[in-house]
Amino acid sequence: MKGVVAPSANRFGHVSPTSAAHVSADLGEYLDAHGDLILDGGDCQVGVESTIVLATGSQPVILRPGAVTAADIKRITGVEVSEETTNAPRVSGALDSHYSPTAQVILITAVSQSTFESKAGFLALAQTPTPTGLVRLASPETIEDFAHELYGSLRAGDDLKLKTIYVVPPSGDGLAQAINDRLQRAAF
């Protein structure tokens, strides 16, 4: 059995691109120097990268969570899928530190109990109020919106030269789990 491999259109460890403009910002000089082009098919629909499943053993294992969950796979195929339990990275994006902007990402659970630096960004679901003095990078209404806007928001923080981005991670399973996986790595 052979796997499928495709390169990411960003520099290793950096925030993943979700638009052609992001690819150009990361790789434009390299592409221009080699006469390569960027094919713009519009912004990514989901935002966070795909689910990666290892299907070589008797039970498939999710190596990287994404929009497709273990429950989705079981519902469609009837096959039980487990989640990776080892800390050893086996796939892209599984290092402790990955998807990282230049700004420091700090995960917080409660806005009212936090002290914030000035000139910092903020990302949370829309119903969470923006603390005074912070720059709201996005106001996603749903978990799906959060996933779609996550990387663009982290890149916007870098574009604004923010030193810190405070994030209130969404709670829940499924896509929220994938978002939290990416946020944990960005904050490492």
Residue positions per predicted region:
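Active-site-adjacent structural elements in enzyme catalytic cores
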Residues: M1-F188
